[in-house]
């Protein structure tokens, strides 16, 4: 009986140690992902100045949501962290989403290429002019739910704005 208790205690200690290590590793991976996105963001704005700045936390939160912290197939195989679709016809420039040949997800050469594309999309594409205008007029954003509600053409999930707003909130406390 003593041997069983000792074995059980040892197993519990090992499992707890494994859980802590796994949690620490997960947190480190998340921090590394944020740093990578932030590095691309900073590089973009060192070169590009304009009348609209898309907030870093906005870009990062959408990348986190759309790519599952960079773990999605599209992020890993195509450096697509924002779920950007394409009409490209050359297979080198797209991946098929979920076996549906009609849904093509764009491929990028690097994470930074995708971050640059996303920022330009939001800042300059007429379909997102309400979003760009919001950021032009509101340099200090405290509630992102309003601006996220202007992105209906970007997402299909009706809960998407709330999910991304939740990520933004958690990043502001990170």
Regions found by a protein language model. Give the residues of each.
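Catalytic cores of secreted/periplasmic lytic hydrolases that degrade extracellular macromolecules
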Residues: 17-60, 65-174
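Bacterial Sec-dependent N-terminal signal peptides
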Residues: 1-24
